[in-house]
Amino acid sequence: MAWCPWKHDLLATGSTYPDGKIKIWSTSSISGRNSEPLHTIPLNTSVNSLHWSPHCKELLSTQGSSFLHVPPPRSSRRNNVSRADSALTTVQTPLTNSIAVHEYPSCKRLLTLTQAHGSSVTHSCISPNGEHIFTVCPKEEAIKMWQVWAEPLSLGMKESPFAKFTIR
């Protein structure tokens, strides 16, 4: 889960097997048990961590194993078996053990760093300056640092022509 730093009512959540989706919620529009998310990003991959960029409207996700819904045999289909009853198989996809950056609010994937680690990226954190992501893979016994976002452009205040003069 991750709260959005520049739009305080946005909460991103990620799910694992068998759902494998990122959901973005607005706490100002949640009403009761049957609330729907503002956006859903289907990945068919375990979403292990999420981070909003403090500098731009982007959401970073780290992933683990990917999976595919396998339809039941033909004999089962005649009995109206739903997708929920279908088997799930672990597969290798570009999102397996990856880092992905998604644009908000379009939810378009801007970047995928495939195979960021050789196994599941189990945890990550954002650096204090909001530019780097640190990822952990216990199976590799490795911590990696990734520069994801650049330093924000400083708009800087121009000095007023009257700044050097005081009334008192």
Feature names for model-found ranges:
Residues 33-37, 44-48, 53-58, 63-168:
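Terminal intrinsically disordered, low-complexity extensions flanking WD-repeat/beta-propeller proteins
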Residues 1-4, 8-56, 61-63:
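A beta-strand-loop signature enriched in Asp, Gly, Thr, and Trp
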